[in-house]
Amino acid sequence: MSTELKRINRKYDYFDPENPSRTIIMSCDVDQDSAYDIIEIISYINEFDDDNEANVKDYIRKPIKMIINSYGGSVYDGFAIIGVMETSKTPIHTYCYGSAMSMGFLIFVSGHYRYAHRMCTFMYHECLDQPIYDKLTTLRENIDETKRIMDVYDKQLLAKTTLKRKQLDDSKKAKFDWYMDSVQAMKYKITDEVI
């Protein structure tokens, strides 16, 4: 395991062999560097807990606390983080302070238990794509891929909340960013608790 974290808060000792920190602060864009750091930390804590579960009688896994304040970023890197979160035997509790927007929003709702500060803001919108100045075939392929990842995103969001497909589709048709506060987050089961 590397101890040189690229984007995540370095004040915590995530790789302490006796007592690794269980607080991850994601106050950055979702990109390859932040995804690498988060995946490495979650994997290390799971290995630590697996070892202790096998060797320490009545060992109980303590949750990982993931604090999120992010405008989002790369969908593919976000999906990588979510994949590791979903397969983590150690529970991951997500906390939103500030904002969880776009891919940051989907990472937040993918926590095993979710807390939202009363002043936080969530935002859902249609996946954004970079303009491509290329052949028509390439443009079509890019559109198809954007539709596919939007469908994956929406299915995850619908599975984790009480939001309805029509609400998401209406938001996309109206071409607006859908902002939600903590009260709406409770209404749609985006969060389990407001703190």
Positions of predicted regions on the chain:
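Terminal-region recognition feature
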Residues: 1-195
